[in-house]
Amino acid sequence: MENILCAANAVNMMFYFNEEKYGILPQDVKDELKVICVLYCSDVGGMISLSFDESYKLIITTMEPIDEIGAELKVKKIQSEKAELFEKLEEFAEKLDKLSAEKEKKS
């Protein structure tokens, strides 16, 4: 099951951040994620989402970009430029899930 971290949609000009699950992230990280998503949508259109798979790998999913080739290049650029941030987010998501599981066991 994938856990959505954030998403943006160029058509509706909307940004979504999963505040319920990841709200404890620092505001500057939330802001950076918003910039990543909104700039992607502004540049190539369509939708973008950042989520974690079962092994806590950050997955970038895109849909319906106006420019398919530009979208692929933009995703590769994001992955390259934000590799350190994404690695830390993956570690954070894994630790957060482990803490949540421990809390559930205790209650």
Region spans (language model):
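Negatively charged, low-complexity tracts enriched in Asp/Glu with abundant Ser/Thr
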Residues: 1-43
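Intrinsically disordered, low-complexity segments enriched in glycine/proline and serine/threonine
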Residues: 5, 35, 75, 84, ...
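Short acidic DE-rich linear segments
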Residues: 1-3, 98-107
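Short, flexible coil/linker elements and helix-boundary hinge sites characteristic
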Residues: 23, 41, 82, 104-105
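Amphipathic protein-protein interaction modules
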Residues: 40-95
